[in-house]
From Swiss-Prot:
Gene that this sequence comes from: argS
Family matches, as PANTHER family: ARGININE--TRNA LIGASE, CYTOPLASMIC, ARGINYL-TRNA SYNTHETASE
GO biological process, one term: arginyl-tRNA aminoacylation
Gene Ontology terms, MF aspect: arginine-tRNA ligase activity; ATP binding
Predominant subcellular localization, coarse grouping: cytoplasm
Protein name: Arginine--tRNA ligase
Amino acid sequence: MKSHIQSLLEQTIESFKQQGILPADFEARIQVDRTKDKSHGDLATNLAMMLTKVAGKNPRELAQLIIDTLPASAFVAKVEIAGPGFINFFINDSALADQLQNAVNDEHLGIKLPTPQTVVVDYSSPNLAKEMHVGHLRSTIIGDSVVRALEFLGHKVIRQNHVGDWGTQFGMLLAYMEELRAKNGEQAHLELSDLETFYRAAKLRFDESAEFATRARQLVVELQSGDEYCNKLWREFNDISLSHCHEVYARLGVSLTRADVHGESAYNADLEQVVKDLDAQGLLTESNGAKVVFQEAFRNKEGEALPVIIQKADGGYLYATSDLAAMRYRSNVLKADRVLYFVDLRQALHFQQVFSLAKLAKFVREDMSLEHLGFGTMNGEDGRPFKTRSGGVVKLVDLLEEANVRALELVRSKNPDMDEETLAEIARVVGISAVKYADLSKNRTSDYIFSFEQMLSFEGNTAPYLLYAYTRVAGIFKRVTGLDLSQAKIVLEHEKEKDLGNKLAQFGEILNRVVDKGQPHVLCAYLYELAGAFSSFYEACPVLAADNDEQKNSRLLLSQLTARTLQKGLNLLGIETLERM
């Protein structure tokens, strides 16, 4: 509905250009918002006030001219001017009912699909050789929810798990294995059963022994040079580490597969060429032995140019080098229209610099959109980054296990007579959903406080509340036998029916915001509001005890659409629904 009003206003703008009211090359930014007070209509725009200067007319006069020029629409019952020049649109109830009727038998719930694009999404991307920790949660689940929404809206999505599968950490592991082999022979391989412990021991040696650190760096060079033994062990380290990652993904219900892994090592062959191409364009400068690029737009507080380091003095490459190679691959090979990077906000400057350099060096097409969708940190209840009591990093698998244990206690307390198998399954879904939803419901760019108590509450904007809301709606249909709604029609008479219908009709515009801005929290807020709108409708409008069959069937269709929208919305967040709680 919102996009329909925007389309009417766009046509009006074009008409103004043809009449000479607006310059032919004028580009208007049309904003249409939902009203909070329904006495002011359903939708409103401040377009008249935005155009008043360029059109040379006062806002109310221009607002009336816009109304007079608007194309006729069956969706609009009336249009009014309010205040200094706001234009309020009142939606036709019968047209809204028709829109909802069309959604009933549509797999996309009546959503008009946008022009499909090829979208590369870079998310999760943990460093290998050690276990995933809570710091990997946000990129993994925010990226996955946006991916799901993009696919639902018809876009071609290419997942890219840009894992850190190269570099110094592998030199440490190789050097440590070398030492163990000297002591224990082939038995040294048994140590790899716990790669995390193996990594910590290697890191300790690296920090304590300069000789060990030198050997580790030498082995990185041998690995990069294609040494057969080093590469065999490297593949083994990666395989063990990736197996752990995918166990976590499976538990989280994340859609990443082994086929989506395209790590740093995938770009090794192109790194030297990246340096040569930058040099050939005269972009490289030598600074303290390193090869760097300075861009005028990036300076520190003292006004000094900030470098993008492409190659270190010792010949090693950095993140910027592999990121540039990846961007070129995503532009030229994957043919991406958009590339989305779900990476910590603290990397904002890095991405601004490499995005700018990629365009400057023509490594990517000018029309390809590069977007860093950064996120804040997950903090403990003390407001500091989430840690164990001893100050260590919290493993993601341990966090999920604790969520499961707490959810089991909660579900058992509410269902003391339920069998253990059913309890365990409900607790699994509730625990994982609570962790994911608590994160996804927060603005992506904000830090947030992690609290099991809040996320497992059945009150407020939480996963347990929404899972229960879904079972409540779906439960209506368990009380009906021989139901046939094939000839039923949606009729919006009661005010609460209209409120619910209006909320259902917003699903498409909400999903477009999710994919345009990478903000799943707007979907969470919408689902919470939808559950509230249904609750108000259900209290005011008897469904199974309606006055007549026509009214009952209409309300059953509204209930069915609500259940489908809640389920689809939760699924797009990567959350399973339950048939009973």
